[in-house]
Amino acid sequence: MKKIEIYTTNYCPFCVKAKSLLNKKKIKFYEIDVSNDEALREKMSAMANGARSVPQIFADNILIGDCDKIHKLDNEKKLDKLLGLEQKA
């Protein structure tokens, strides 16, 4: 499975929603709180093509997207593959 990182703040309802989806799918992830750390937010922004909003979700340092994006991908049955969850035949 890929290393999943989610950049969050402690006051973001979309972060809670994104983490809830990952937890529901039993996906292990590393949460990086950028609430009070401008250097971490800048790092996240650089990796997220300039986006400063949270959450931002990455799989093996590759941007997957924000809360809306991961829910859209999940509804389209594409999220598992991007996160490295698909079973090999």
Annotate each predicted stretch with a short phrase.
Residues 1-30:
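Local sequence-structure signature of Cys/Sec-based thiol-disulfide redox active-site neighborhoods
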Residues 23-28, 46-47, 71-72, 81:
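Non-catalytic interaction surface on structured domains
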Residues 30-32, 62:
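Structural signal for short hydrophobic segments within the conserved structured cores
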Residues 34-52, 82-85:
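Thioredoxin-like thiol-disulfide oxidoreductase module
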Residues 49-58, 68:
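Structural micro-motif
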